[in-house]
């Protein structure tokens, strides 16, 4: 997986649009603002505000208050109510934004966008070539602050109309929301009254006539009594017209007549035209935002200043954004209060790793040039490293990201087809993405891109749509490759976006072979005329003795079935390719897909296996995950809002084809990372019935060595927690589990018969969760392995509370858990509280003779205990002999294993002991292990010297050889 930039957008509410983005510029600095309105706030409680500017250019502190233009108390109160309503309205954040915590709001902290002034000559130049279209804005153009937009121009003329333009995702909606909130909180003192309009809202009114006063009064009720005074406000009245591309404006007098009366009913587009002509309210200030393709809808003579909304022009601004985002106090807290909040140290670590990757990985820096991709990076990191809200998937993050940027957007409002911008992107960019996945490449030449964009274009209207897409949205999806040796090529802005769009291209049914296209047309034609022809042929067959007619009659019926089977075969082929990609074993990228995604964002700590030889074969393991995720009901509903509906029947048939292939390949034993990818696919699909059927044959869950982050624990618990059949074994050894992960995985543990939690650094705190697990009435665990965890005596005291009330556990391993004498004495005192235990392993716990002997005696008296492991403890020669004698003293009672020998014979448990040593050789203290092995070797030599039985001597010699080999291995690895 590899790496690109923008900030998202959502609706303002009923008819308005809003976004969540914060662009900026080069040298950020902080300004702490105070309230300018007569020394007091316009409304609301005190609120700290920090502004991070995108440029070093800033205006002076707000000047003193102008003379009041609305002198009456009632008018002042009406405007104050208007401020309060706007602030409440524009402060609302979409659900996707709220997951970052309530403190990240536009009225408390903000990174100002970079706005670079441009000229009409630049806008009228011919469109740049594809390669140049993706270049950042020229550094020489002066940046503008929000407060400077209406400053006099270079000739000293007053600027009344400002047009701000930017491609999809540069943050036009967020800029408008921020500007409105600035005015609400008194930070734009130059304007007495601000009236925002959404052009999308106005376009939805159609040709129904309404006056400007009616439009304002309908949307902002408190302003009814201020409307007669609007003309007197002059330049202190600011209209904000957001999303001009949604309106069809005609500035010809023949098309739109002149009108200066704000109370005269007209079409909404005519009102906007006369406002921009300065024929209606000629002194009012107007701010317009639009996509680049619609700039020409306003003649340049009516515009005082053009400004391009740009992205984060250097990595310092990107770092600032990430610090603000990821260091929010509630950033790591799960929705609904579940899970554990990320600590400040963990958040700082994420920011530091991301900063290092931004400095060393130029492609991700190029991606984050667009602020909305910075949002996507933060959302992905939040998903990967924080407790995940129920139902949130990686696919839903990407789908929501596209909804925030494309919701309600049509490609061209003047085109009668009203084609969705996202639907056009799915058809063109999806084709390019899928061709890249199928040919296993992520770099595309200009010919590749043009080939997908221009495929099938035949009419002038289609070329016009392509031109609009290239100007408004192409660089949202594609970025120039900045890697050495890749000049002139393009990559998808974010690597995962290629796989998402490829999956979308498939599930939307846009990939069709020539045979399928022809077959579909033939089948539809036959279907339309088939009934009539069949009726005629049926009559003729009865009247005329023609034997060929029944055959022809049946052939007509067969044609739709043949086409249906052809489509079904195509779906099966896609499912086959998807499943093969999911279970494809890689030599280089063998981490699970979530770790791969995290590494692509944060970088890889430490050297790669082959630093000078990157893999030639690209990995597209997210592609099948996104395919499953896009078929989920939630994502299909969001895609329908974007103009990309997936039919229920198509989703069902695709799911059935995938299930058929998964049922065959899913039965094989998978490596831990591949098994997690399999479970992650089911998590993305969000269909419990589907997952239960496919995973019904899963009996062993082996995720040993997989780093179980909060999201991975959530994935495993969500997919396997609701299953009914028992799991023979759950192996989570060396998974970096913590108590929060144990709590998340509780539903899975309740299905397990054998549970392995070795090498997880679980301490006494985790024993509380293990106690609750053992006391659960559905617990069916028979074997519990907790070796190589620092449980200590305090943890075992808690664990014994669970064992006292548990009736299922028969085998318990506490090998190398730091129990010491205190822990073994505690076990000896409370062992009789459990009546089912059959085997107890407390080897390598640093216990002495007294504690070990006490536990051995308690074990001998236990009604069910059969085996007690005490080897590798700090036992003297006399202590070992006493324990050996105790273990074989009488019939019945537990056998005590303290050495590789039993008298003059080899212990039948010698292989168990040595295999434990071999398995933990790299994690145990080498000097201590070497000392214990030397003691065991001495026991073997003594036993061999004390026996005359040649068979026993041979066995002892064999075991001696195994011990010596381990000692040599210790010595060589130590050196």
UniProtKB/Swiss-Prot annotation:
SUPFAM superfamilies hit by this protein: RNI-like
Keyword Mitochondrion: yes
Residue ranges occupied by any NACHT domain in the UniProt entry: 160-483
LRR repeats: 695-718, 724-747, 749-777, 778-801, 811-834, 835-857, 858-877, 878-899
Binding residues for ATP: 166-173
Location in the cell: Mitochondrion outer membrane
Annotated InterPro entries: Leu-rich_rpt, LRR_dom_sf, NACHT_NTPase, NLR, NLRX1_C, P-loop_NTPase
GO biological process: innate immune response; negative regulation of canonical NF-kappaB signal transduction; negative regulation of inflammatory response; negative regulation of innate immune response; negative regulation of interferon-beta production; negative regulation of interleukin-6 production; negative regulation of macrophage cytokine production; negative regulation of RIG-I signaling pathway
Segments forming domain LRRNT: 667-694
A cellular-component GO term for this protein: mitochondrial outer membrane
Residue ranges, annotated region (Required for interaction with MAVS): 75-556
Residue ranges of the region described as Required for the repression of MAVS-induced interferon signaling: 556-974
Free-text tissue specificity from the UniProt record: Ubiquitously expressed. Strongest expression in mammary gland, heart and muscle. Detected in HeLa, HEK293T, THP-1, HL-60, Raji and Jurkat cell lines (at protein level).
Biological function: Participates in antiviral signaling. Acts as a negative regulator of MAVS-mediated antiviral responses, through the inhibition of the virus-induced RLH (RIG-like helicase)-MAVS interaction. Instead, promotes autophagy by interacting with TUFM and subsequently recruiting the autophagy-related proteins ATG5 and ATG12. Also regulates MAVS-dependent NLRP3 inflammasome activation to attenuate apoptosis. Has no inhibitory function on NF-kappa-B signaling pathway, but enhances NF-kappa-B and JUN N-terminal kinase dependent signaling through the production of reactive oxygen species.
Classification via PANTHER family: NACHT, LRR AND CARD DOMAINS-CONTAINING
Comment text on domains: The LRRCT domain mediates homodimerization and LRRNT mediates trimerization of the dimers.
Subunit structure: Homohexamer. Interacts with MAVS. Interacts with TUFM. (Microbial infection) Interacts with influenza A virus protein PB1-F2.
Family membership noted in the UniProt record: Belongs to the NLRP family.
The name this protein goes by in its record: NLR family member X1
Species of the source: Homo sapiens (Human)
Gene designation: NLRX1
């Amino acid at each position: 997986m590899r790496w690109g930039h923008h900030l998202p957008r959502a609706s303002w509410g009923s008819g308005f649009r809003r976004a969540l983005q914060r662009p900026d510029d080069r040298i950020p600095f902080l300004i702490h603002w105070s309230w300018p309105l007569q020394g007091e706030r316009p409304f609301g409680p005190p609120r700290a505000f920090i502004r991070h500017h995108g440029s070093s250019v800033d205006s002076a502190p707000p000047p003193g208050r102008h003379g009041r233009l609305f002198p009456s108390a009632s008018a002042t109160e009406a405007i104050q109510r208007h401020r309060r309503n706007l602030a409440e309205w524009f402060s609302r954040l979409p659900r996707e934004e709220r997951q970052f915590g309530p403190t990240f709001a536009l009225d408390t902290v903000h990174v100002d966008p970079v706005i670079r002034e441009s000229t009409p000559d630049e806008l009228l130049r011919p469109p740049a070539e594809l390669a140049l279209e993706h270049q950042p804005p020229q550094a020489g153009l002066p940046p503008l602050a929000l407060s400077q937009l209406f400053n006099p121009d270079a000739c000293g003329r007053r600027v009344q109309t400002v047009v701000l333009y930017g491609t999809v995702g540069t943050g036009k909606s967020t800029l408008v929301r921020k500007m409105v909130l600035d005015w609400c909180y008194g930070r734009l003192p130059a304007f007495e009254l601000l009236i925002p309009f959404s052009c999308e809202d106005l376009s939805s009114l159609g040709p129904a006539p309404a006056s400007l006063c009616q439009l304002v009064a309908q949307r902002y009720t408190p302003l009814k009594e201020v409307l007669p005074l609007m003309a007197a406000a002059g330049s202190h009245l600011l209209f904000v017209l957001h999303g001009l591309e949604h309106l069809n404006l005609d500035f010809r007098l023949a098309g739109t007549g002149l009108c200066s009366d704000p109370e005269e009913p007209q079409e909404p587009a005519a009102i906007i035209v006369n406002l921009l002509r300065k024929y209606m309210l000629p002194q009012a200030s107007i701010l317009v935002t639009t996509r680049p393709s619609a700039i020409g809808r306003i003649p340049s003579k009516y515009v005082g200043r053009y400004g391009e909304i740009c992205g984060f022009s250097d990595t310092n601004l990107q770092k600032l954004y990430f610090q603000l985002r990821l260091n929010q106090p509630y950033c790591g807290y799960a929705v609904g209060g579940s899970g554990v909040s990320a600590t400040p140290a963990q958040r700082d670590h994420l920011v530091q790793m991301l900063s290092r990757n931004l400095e060393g990985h130029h492609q991700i820096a190029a991606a984050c040039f667009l602020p909305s991709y910075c949002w996507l990076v933060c959302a992905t990191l939040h998903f990967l490293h924080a407790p995940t809200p129920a139902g949130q998937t990686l696919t839903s993050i990407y789908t929501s990201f596209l909804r925030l940027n494309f919701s309600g957007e049509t490609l061209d409002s003047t085109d009668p087809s009203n084609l969705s911008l996202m639907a056009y992107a799915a058809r063109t960019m999806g084709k390019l993405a899928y061709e890249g996945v199928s040919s296993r490449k992520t770099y595309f030449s200009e010919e590749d891109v043009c080939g997908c964009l221009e495929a099938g274009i035949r009419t002038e209207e289609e070329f016009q749509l392509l031109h609009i897409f290239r100007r408004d949205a192409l660089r949202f999806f594609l970025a120039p490759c900045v890697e050495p040796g890749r000049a002139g090529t393009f990559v998808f802005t974010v690597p995962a976006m290629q796989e998402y769009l490829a999956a979308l291209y498939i599930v939307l049914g846009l990939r069709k072979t020539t045979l399928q296209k022809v077959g579909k047309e033939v089948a539809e034609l036959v279907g339309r005329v088939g009934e009539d022809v069949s009726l005629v042929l049926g009559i003729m067959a009865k009247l005329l003795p023609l034997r060929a007619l029944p055959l022809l009659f049946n052939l007509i019926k067969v044609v739709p079935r043949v086409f249906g089977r052809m489509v079904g075969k195509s779906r099966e082929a896609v499912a086959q390719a998807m499943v093969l990609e999911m279970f494809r074993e890689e030599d280089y990228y063998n981490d699970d897909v979530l770790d791969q995604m995290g590494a692509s964002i944060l970088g890889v700590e430490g050297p790669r296996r082959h630093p000078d030889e990157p893999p030639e074969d690209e990995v597209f393991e997210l592609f099948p995950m996104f395919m499953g995720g896009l078929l989920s009901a939630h994502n299909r509903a969001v895609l329908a809002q974007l103009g990309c509906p997936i039919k229920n029947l198509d989703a069902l048939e695709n799911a059935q084809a995938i299930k058929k292939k998964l049922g065959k390949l899913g039965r094989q034993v998978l490596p831990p990372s591949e098994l997690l990818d399999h479970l992650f696919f089911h998590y993305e699909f969000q269909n419990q019935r589907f997952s239960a059927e496919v995973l019904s044959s899963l009996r062993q869950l082996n995720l040993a060595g997989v780093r179980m982050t909060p999201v991975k624990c959530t994935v495993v618990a969500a997919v396997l927690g609701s299953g009914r059949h028992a799991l023979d074994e759950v192996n989570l050894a060396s998974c970096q589990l913590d108590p929060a992960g144990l709590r998340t995985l509780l539903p899975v543990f309740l299905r397990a018969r054998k549970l392995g939690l070795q090498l997880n650094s679980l301490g006494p705190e985790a024993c509380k969760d293990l106690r609750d697990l053992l006391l659960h009435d559905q617990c069916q665990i028979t074997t519990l392995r907790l070796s190589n965890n620092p449980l200590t005596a305090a943890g075992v005291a808690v664990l014994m509370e669970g064992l006292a009330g548990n009736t299922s556990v028969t085998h318990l391993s506490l090998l190398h858990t730091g129990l010491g004498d205190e822990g073994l004495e505690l076990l000896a005192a409370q062992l009789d509280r459990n009546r089912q235990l059959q085997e107890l392993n407390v080897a390598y716990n640093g216990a002495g003779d007294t504690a070990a002997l006490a536990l051995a005696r308690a074990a001998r008296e236990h009604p069910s205990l059969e085996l007690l492991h005490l080897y590798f403890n700090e036992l003297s020669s006399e202590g070992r002999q006493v324990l050996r004698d105790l273990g074989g003293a009488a019939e019945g009672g537990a056998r005590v294993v303290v050495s590789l020998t039993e008298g003059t014979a080899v212990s039948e448990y010698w292989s168990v002991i040595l295999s434990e040593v071999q398995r933990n050789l790299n994690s145990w203290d080498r000097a201590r292990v070497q000392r214990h092995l030397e003691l065991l070797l001495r026991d073997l030599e003594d036993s061999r010297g004390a026996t005359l039985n040649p068979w026993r001597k041979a066995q002892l010699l064999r075991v001696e050889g195994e011990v010596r080999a381990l000692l040599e291995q210790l010595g060589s690895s130590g050196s």
